[in-house]
């Protein structure tokens, strides 16, 4: 049983350094991890030697008498004393080693574009016929033709209203001002038709994924520190998640976290894999690094609902499953009729857990750009090692770390922003995507065909 990153650290540390460099991280962490792991192994071997010596001496004592016996007893005590000291050192080394191993990022897949940030992300395909305001045509071409894609689009001569103004001024179905007063920035109140739309989106995603055999899960909304350490890179993301004061608990930022922990510390027979789950949960995020980006509206908020795909897989199957997960997300957005592109995320923008990541970005007509709606990652054995989740091979009962993968299906508030911008009419009416209508029909007060603007009062 071997963790891929530890194997590379021991056998080809210089190669592992190259992977760390691709992420634009300091490669010296590899040297420190290599040195500490080597010292830990040598100390472990020395402890085994000391124990063997002590056992040999202890077996000799009953056979001896007088001075010889006293000498052996003294030798045994000395060995025990040394053993105690070395075991203390080993414990310290184990803690240091684990911290260093946990700080190592995943191995970057060979198909990932190398670059320090999202400006190096590479679009790989487009879908749909975007509506492009005449003032954004050059901007649109910069996001399509620059990468060698000729995307058909519809020119409109009226500029669409941004989702924030649509929500609060045109439809009057949201209030971020009052939410800001009572909870702070990046919170919101949503009302009536938008709430129904939120629920319909979640039902739409769940209906599709459960029909494909995914097991529906309502997970815990909080996790212990030990578990969070296994799921994410806590050193990087500790300021992005909420901690419950006075408790060893953190609010989840996505259902991925509790779904990854669902089989923590388990050995799973290979014939049971893949295990496919679809989780639904609220998500809580500090958005500490967002600064002043997307302060208006509900695109980047502290809480939202999300349907998440999560799979436990055999290593040899995981790359095919990654394509399945992004394909599922594409199916949902095609059903909604929202134009999008799939982007291969650059190495410096991956985040420590992912070996490779795709984003699905929806076209936002009022902004004149594509924005992230879905994130799909193959984490390979990065989480499995930290949470000790292994698969058992039938031949020889060999245990090895399995692979975990995750992908957004629908993040409701972000998808609502895309609907408000893509399906608005010049008069402010928003057409409801046809695929959502059957999920809205169960509510007597829900909109079925369209959401209409509030009529302006006459003076």
Curated annotation (Swiss-Prot):
Residue positions binding ATP: 285-287, 301, 372-375
PROSITE patterns, alphabetized: AA_TRNA_LIGASE_II
First-level EC class: ligase
E.C. designation(s): 6.1.1.11
Molecular function, one GO term: ATP binding
Binding site for L-serine: 254-256, 308, 408
Entry keywords, A to Z: Aminoacyl-tRNA synthetase, ATP-binding, Cytoplasm, Ligase, Nucleotide-binding, Protein biosynthesis
Presence of keyword Repeat: no
Catalytic activity: tRNA(Ser) + L-serine + ATP = L-seryl-tRNA(Ser) + AMP + diphosphate + H(+); tRNA(Sec) + L-serine + ATP = L-seryl-tRNA(Sec) + AMP + diphosphate + H(+)
Superkingdom as given in the UniProt entry: Archaea
InterPro entries named in the record: aa-tRNA-synt_IIb (IPR002314), aa-tRNA-synth_II (IPR006195), aa-tRNA-synth_II/BPL/LPL (IPR045864), Ser-tRNA-ligase_type_1 (IPR002317), Ser-tRNA-synth_1_N (IPR015866), SerRS_1_N_sf (IPR042103), SerRS_core (IPR033729), tRNA-bd_arm (IPR010978)
Domain remark text: Consists of two distinct domains, a catalytic core and a N-terminal extension that is involved in tRNA binding.
Family: Belongs to the class-II aminoacyl-tRNA synthetase family. Type-1 seryl-tRNA synthetase subfamily.
Record text on subunit structure and interactions: Homodimer. The tRNA molecule binds across the dimer.
HAMAP family hit by this protein: Ser_tRNA_synth_type1
Name of the featured protein: Serine--tRNA ligase
Organism: Staphylothermus marinus (strain ATCC 43588 / DSM 3639 / JCM 9404 / F1)
Lineage: Archaea, Thermoproteota, Thermoprotei, Desulfurococcales, Desulfurococcaceae
Gene for this chain: serS
């Amino acid at each position: 049983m071997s963790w891929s990153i530890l194997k590379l650290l021991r056998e080809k540390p210089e190669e592992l350094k190259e992977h760390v460099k691709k992420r634009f991280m300091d490669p010296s962490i590899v040297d420190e991890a290599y040195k500490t792991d080597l010292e830990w192994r040598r100390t472990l071997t020395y402890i085994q030697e000391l124990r063997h010596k002590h056992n040999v001496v202890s077996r000799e004592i009953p056979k001896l008498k007088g001075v010889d016996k006293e000498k052996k007893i003294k030798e045994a005590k000395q060995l025990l004393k040394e053993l105690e000291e070395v075991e203390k050192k080993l414990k310290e080394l184990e803690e240091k080693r684990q911290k260093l191993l946990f700080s190592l990022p995943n191995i970057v897949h060979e198909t990932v574009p190398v670059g320090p940030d999202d400006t190096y992300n590479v679009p790989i395909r487009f879908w749909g016929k975007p509506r492009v305001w005449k003032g954004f045509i050059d901007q649109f071409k910069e996001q399509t033709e620059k990468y060698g894609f000729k995307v058909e689009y519809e020119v409109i001569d009226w500029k669409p209203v941004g989702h924030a103004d649509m929500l609060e001024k045109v439809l009057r179905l949201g209030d971020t001002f009052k939410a800001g007063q009572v909870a702070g920035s990046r919170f919101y109140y949503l009302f009536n038709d938008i709430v129904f739309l939120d629920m319909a989106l979640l039902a739409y995603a769940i209906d599709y994924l459960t029909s494909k055999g995914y097991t529906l899960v309502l997970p815990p909304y909080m996790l212990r520190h030990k578990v969070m350490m296994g799921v994410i890179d806590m050193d990087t993301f500790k300021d992005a998640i909420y901690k419950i004061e006075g408790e060893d608990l953190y609010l989840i930022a996505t259902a991925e976290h509790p779904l990854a922990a669902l089989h923590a510390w388990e050995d799973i027979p290979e014939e049971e894999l893949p295990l496919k789950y679809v989780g639904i949960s609220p998500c809580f995020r500090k958005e500490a690094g967002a600064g002043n980006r997307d302060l208006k509206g509900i695109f980047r908020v502290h809480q939202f609902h999300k349907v998440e795909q999560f799979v436990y897989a055999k290593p040899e199957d995981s790359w095919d499953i990654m394509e399945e997960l992004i394909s599922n997300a594409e199916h949902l957005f095609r059903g909604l009729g929202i134009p999008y592109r799939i982007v291969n995320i650059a190495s410096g923008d991956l985040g420590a857990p992912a070996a490779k990541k795709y984003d699905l970005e929806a076209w936002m007509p009022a902004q004149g750009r594509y924005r992230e709606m879905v994130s799909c990652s193959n984490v390979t054995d990065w989480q499995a090692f930290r949470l000790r989740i292994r698969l058992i091979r039938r031949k020889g009962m060999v245990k090895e770390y399995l692979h975990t993968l995750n992908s957004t299906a629908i993040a409701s508030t972000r998808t609502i922003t895309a609907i408000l911008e893509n399906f608005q009419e010049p008069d402010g009416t928003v057409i409801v995507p046809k695929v959502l209508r059957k999920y809205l029909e169960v509510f007597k007060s829900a909109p079925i065909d369209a959401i209409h603007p509030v009529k302006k009062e006459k003076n």
